[in-house]
């Protein structure tokens, strides 16, 4: 007989589970209060009895720490229960092991495990548990999962999916598929939020393989626009935190994201899944930190903006050269040249009677070649002085030691990173490929190679990071990946889409990243879930991706509207905004080619409640947003308006990239506007 066979039985069971959860939450509240009261009593006792003996203090200290630990555990339990009381579970499979006399077990799957200590049964299984993987990977029939004891084989006889909101079951679907299309369509048709949401209820089989991949030391995810790659990467982090709890925690992970707006947009996913937020940084922050924040530099955003507004052949040539594997090979040869030619040993008169010969000092420089060059001075000094002590039986003073170290350091001509970097271009006979901007400002493309040289000379591995997640992988150059590999010799998840590069002269494909990191398993996501079929089809005309498979969710055809002049175009955009405001949509993105165009549009529209997001913004907001295509990467909106799509504004390859990014932000409705006689040739 099937457990909870009818929908009526399922609704009744759901209410039982919610009542039990609320009962346990109530008990934990009492327990938390008891621990707080006990700690307050200890505090009062210690305050009132200042003369108690050390043994009693020690005993009380242990009791206080014990109450703290138990109290924190109870609070953590309450937090997890509170997360599932509104939506206890979203799926169910009935599974029977193949071995004899095993009953059919109903397995309800939710965001967290709920083990009822009273009945000693697991009522809800965490979506990350090994047994839960069958919900995503199998249809009805034979199935298996990997348990700590090995592979467990069996049969799935029933599969259900539920939509539960605020403790009420909206509907239930019998499903023979991995994730039923009706459920997926309903989720995809929903409106965009101000934060990215978890997708545990609709994870697809190919996405699940990426999330649960434990073997790959470096996993490179190439996913088409709207394939959910960022969300999948975050669910992968949540899975790894669950699977390896005890050996890795949230603070051991680092996310490299493109900007603070995007970092804020994705900040809700891990807490929704019951994990702590993960540290986040940007590529340029990390590179600048390696260089001890010594140099002013053009940001990546400023580089892209210059390429969009006033590109010059020389600037493009410098970027392309520094993004090539030939450049990396040349840098490596130059580092060997430094090793062999930059240390010029000299005799050092240590005392009136003792001189350290140049040959001996030179020998020690190469003896300690396991260290980065600048790290050798300390070891060389200690070794030389130890040898002097053996030979001359004397002990040097601190002043003599410091003098020797200073002299050894002076013999090395590579103590200034920037000078060494300039030397490289002279050595290559290409001095024109290095250019400092006004106020001694470095170009963005010089930041990574300068950091690469610094690490070769100084060292700088960051072993505190156990897993590195790099998003928008296509916008980073091979030399940047080389720096990341040297800085973070840990496991990595790298994700992006080669079709969405805003850095066409310095971008990387999955194969290039694999080559730069010397390792990496590439997994691909072809299905696009974000946009309607019509919007995806329109985007394909701008940049064809033969691998992309659109989900069959239909909607309005994108509109391209022509106007006689800018005034008419602006008036039409205001009407489109009014139509949006009267609709059920929650978010509208007005996406311009550049930040200056976006700022100008915001000024001209003069509509209340419009949010202009710049490269300096730090939070994503719901509602009407005016933003550049570069800043919009990774975000999504119910509706998108793209102004000024004339042939003068969108004509170069980088313009095509920006237009593709802008178009693929739209979920349900897309309108492009322009004034003049011709629209961009890309549409």
Language model region names:
Residues 246, 260-276, 281-286, 292-300, ...:
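Conserved helicase motor core of SF1/SF2 NTP-dependent helicases
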Residues 54-73, 211-217, 222-224, 228-231, ...:
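Generic detector of solvent-exposed, compositionally biased contiguous segments
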Residues 85, 91-93, 99-104, 453, ...:
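Domain-scale macromolecular recognition modules
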Residues 92, 209, 218, 252-254, ...:
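Beta-sheet entry/capping signal
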Residues 1-36, 40, 184-303, 633, ...:
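P-loop NTPase Walker
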Residues 1-200, 204, 208-212, 680:
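Extended, charged low-complexity regulatory segments
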Residues 241-468, 475-483, 491:
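Alpha-helical nucleic-acid-binding subdomain
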